[in-house]
Amino acid sequence: MVGHSAQHRSKSSLVSHLLILLIFITIIIEMCLYNKIFKNQRSDDIRDNFNNGGHRVPSNVQNHGTHIRDEAFISGVYYSNWSPYKPRFHFPHDINLKQVSHIYYAFFKINSRTGGIENTDSWSDLEMNLYKSLAIKNSELIKESSNNSVQNILPLGCIGELFYLKNTCSDKKFKVIMSIGGWSDSENFKIIIKDDKLLQNFVDSSVETMFRLGFDGIDLDWEFPGNNESEPRGYLKLVRMLRLKLNSLESQIFGKRTEDHFQLSIAAPAFKDKLFYLPITEIDQYVDYWNMMTYDYYGSWSETTGYHSNLFSETELNGNFAMHYMIDRFGVNSRKLVLGMAAYGRSFHIKDNKFEPFNQNTVLINKIFKGVGKPTKEIDKADGKEGIWPYKNLPKIGTIEQYDPKYVSAYCFDEKNSIFISYDNTKSVKTKAEYVTHNNLGGGFWWESCGEAYANESRSLINAFNEGLHFNVSSKPSIFQDVRVKKYYLNKYGDGGFLSPYLKHLDSRKQ
């Protein structure tokens, strides 16, 4: 009995050890597989926590600033309302509408006395008749554009033409967003955030103007809130109120929560010293996209020469740093970040021009410079701005275009006059498109449309960028394509709305 009992205990002990070993192995396997199986879910949860920033979002705002289900990418351009004038003579119908998803119309200004927003150029915005030149360019529109009865009801100005184009361009759907502010009007943001009455009037006026003129959303361009407590917090309050007002308009039109949505975006600084003081995580709850201005890293204000729209560098002045700062520090969803690119170059007159014969290995950055180059007929013809070169006129006559793959920037150098110009070209924007897809960003945009090489497809920045995206560009239609929006507009404004005659014409054409 003693021997049998010992043998039994031995077998029991062996079984126990095997069970313990099996449990241990199971735990190890589960730990190894956990990260692999649940990594994405955990990342989403962490990202959501960062986005909420520990603050509960009001029920009528929740998720309304995060419409990022579209798997396609943004390919957008800013169009300025001074573009139709000399020396640019650039009109909305000159944009390659087949290749863009968003056009940001710049700019509306703030009335500092009332808080309301106003046109910066009423003639360009609402009165200029562009249909004759449009009809000449695009023969398929000649019939309607030359029809006198129809011509009298077409909305005028650049804004009117853009609305017309997004209702007639069958090849590609795109949105037009109203941009408020800009560098020259940013001081007025500081005024309205200090006065609740002015701020409320700004919000009401912005949404009213956006809808009355047929825009698909609002883009805020405050350059830039101060590095203090009051202005960043005031910006947060402004954005929150604006999103609530847009939500209210959506509820009146659609009656309930819907995917149909007026977009709210921010043209954001891409410098650490500006981003650091902004309540990004809290603002992020209310916006759809951050248009990151990842350009103008170097210019006339700099101490040395540099690439002004580079993707990488040894310093923090580059697009890659700005994108990852938004993601890693503030927890912004990468799909809400839109990479900014420049359709222009910045020039420098290098002080030390004692180079060996210039070649692609010649170092032209981090050099002392004396101005940005004297005005020449070439510059005057280009844009009239010293130191600014529209991409379509680059490389400079007499130079050879170069490309720096380390920084992802193009440049050219005029040896005779010691002028160095940095800019984006087809190589750099295609690399940036690959960067966008690799990092799952929201897309890209350009400041501004007049610099694009529309006449030469092989030099087109937009075409090269879209090619890098494998032409996976968003084609969501304007919110004004929805019959409910048109009906609400006509009920609200009757025959007196800016778009009323044309909207009635569209309805009659469908019947």
Curated annotation (Swiss-Prot):
Compartments, record wording: Secreted
SMART domains assigned: Glyco_18
Catalytic site: E223
GO annotation (BP), single: polysaccharide catabolic process
A GO molecular-function descriptor: endochitinase activity
Catalyses which reaction(s): Random endo-hydrolysis of N-acetyl-beta-D-glucosaminide (1->4)-beta-linkages in chitin and chitodextrins
Glycan attachment positions: N147, N228, N456, N472
Keyword vocabulary terms for this entry: Carbohydrate metabolism, Chitin degradation, Glycoprotein, Glycosidase, Hydrolase, Polysaccharide degradation, Secreted, Signal, Sporulation
Coiled coil segments of this chain: none
Hydrolase is among the record's keywords: yes
Keyword Chloroplast on entry: no
Pfam families per record: Glyco_hydro_18
Principal subcellular localisation of the protein: secreted
Signal peptide per UniProt: 1-34
EC numbers, comma separated: 3.2.1.14
Domain of life: Eukaryota
Chain ranges of the GH18 domain: 73-472
Cellular component terms per the entry's GO annotation: cytoplasm; extracellular region
Note: Present with 3050 molecules/cell in log phase SD medium.
Family of this protein: Belongs to the glycosyl hydrolase 18 family. Chitinase class III subfamily.
Name of this chain's protein: Sporulation-specific chitinase 2
Naturally occurring in which organism (per UniProt): Saccharomyces cerevisiae (strain ATCC 204508 / S288c) (Baker's yeast)
Gene name of this polypeptide: CTS2
